[in-house]
């Protein structure tokens, strides 16, 4: 990897062509799934899935099977299992996630130990990413899986959004909440496996969460937040791979650091912008109906809180009263307090 190489010269390398394609598909899929994980406050589920996938990789190595396939099977089974446990209500989501997290680590360690010192593959490439070792077959598999994730997530986004905001309300309207939660968990598992050779199993959560955190700072609606998160994810993935080529740094860490740097810049700008322009609110008058998760009114994500749709307008709880928001405006439109 010569530092003097120009962009056209980079593209003449077959492994770089494959690396950039893999980065593009991962940057496309990860933020689309991550936006619903952020809404459901499951930002760390990608880490749990990653450790289960590591156990799958170890089993694949031990049995001389394709590690990507065994990792996919393990991650999907874990995703279905955690949602079924959570749906039964006997164990909270965070406890089930912790069990999955530590169980994946333990199984991976045991299987790796059984493989002996002469492990026939470098597990570091799955832990931290090794995009330059991606084969043409890997790219085809990643592309197919990523496109399935993107298509399903986009098609189900209204239902996934409703469940993420108010699960009980979605269930009351007749939505199959458990099936939707399992679908989201499976999509997360597939995304983890797709991304493990690009950013690594230990860093995949960052690519699912950080672009969405950045997009939500500036987006005016949920749909625009998804689009911006995908753009940021693709830009950071492709830009990180390109930067790692020139700087001779690990691709996974470079991608994540680039995403975090963009988040910090955006957060700083947003804080300064809000302080200069001010956020004004209009207090709702004669509002006697209490809003909350079980009030029966649709909940809409709005900046860092939730508005409740009521009588053609939106209300948000604020310090003992309700602010009123124009549903035709974004959260950047000033309204008076």
Can you say where each PLM-predicted feature lies in the sequence?
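Transmembrane helix-bundle core of multi-pass membrane transporters
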Residues: 4-9, 13-14, 18, 97-156, ...
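Loop-to-transmembrane alpha-helix initiation sites
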Residues: 19-22, 67-73, 94-98, 143, ...
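Helix-loop-helix "hairpin" substructures at the membrane interface of multi-pass membrane proteins
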Residues: 26, 135-211
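Short loop segments and helix-boundary regions at transmembrane helix junctions
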Residues: 35-118, 216-227, 244-247, 271
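Small-residue-rich segments of transmembrane alpha-helices in multi-pass membrane proteins
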Residues: 52-62, 100-111, 133, 177-187, ...
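Transmembrane alpha-helical segments in multi-pass inner-membrane proteins
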Residues: 198, 202-249, 253
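Membrane-interfacial segments at transmembrane helix termini in multi-pass membrane proteins
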Residues: 260-293
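Histidine-centered metal-binding segments
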Residues: 281-337
């Amino acid at each position: 990897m010569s530092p003097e190489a120009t962009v056209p010269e980079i593209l003449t390398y077959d492994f770089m062509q494959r690396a950039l394609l893999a980065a593009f598909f991962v940057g496309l899929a990860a933020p689309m799934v991550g936006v619903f994980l952020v809404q459901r406050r499951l930002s760390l589920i990608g880490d749990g899935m990653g450790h289960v996938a590591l156990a799958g990789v170890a089993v694949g190595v031990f049995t001389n099977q394709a590690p990507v396939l065994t990792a996919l099977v393990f991650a999907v089974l874990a995703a279905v299992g955690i949602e079924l446990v959570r749906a039964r209500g006997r164990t909270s989501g965070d406890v089930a996630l912790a069990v999955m997290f530590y169980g994946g680590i333990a199984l991976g360690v045991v299987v790796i130990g059984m493989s002996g010192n002469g492990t026939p593959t470098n597990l570091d490439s799955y832990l931290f990413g090794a995009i330059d070792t991606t084969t043409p077959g890997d790219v085809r598999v990643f592309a197919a899986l990523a496109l399935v994730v993107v298509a399903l997530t986009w098609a189900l986004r209204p239902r996934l959004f409703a469940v993420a905001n108010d699960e009980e309300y979605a269930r009351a309207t007749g939505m199959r909440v458990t099936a939707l939660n399992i679908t989201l968990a499976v999509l997360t598992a597939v995304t983890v496996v797709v991304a493990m050779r690009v950013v690594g199993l230990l860093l995949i959560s960052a690519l699912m969460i950080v672009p969405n955190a950045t997009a939500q700072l500036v987006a005016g609606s949920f749909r625009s937040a998804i689009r911006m998160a995908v753009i940021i994810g693709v830009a950071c993935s492709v830009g990180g791979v390109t930067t790692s080529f020139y700087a001779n740094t690990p691709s996974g860490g470079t991608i994540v650091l680039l995403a975090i740097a963009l988040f910090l810049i955006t957060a700083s700008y947003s804080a300064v912008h809000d302080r200069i322009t001010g956020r004004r609110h209009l207090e709702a008058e004669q509002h006697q109906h209490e809003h909350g998760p079980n009030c029966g009114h649709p909940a809409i994500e709005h900046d860092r809180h939730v508005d409740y749709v009521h009588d053609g307008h939106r209300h948000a709880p604020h310090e003992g009263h309700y602010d009123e928001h124009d549903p035709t405006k974004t959260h950047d439109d000033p309204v008076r307090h």
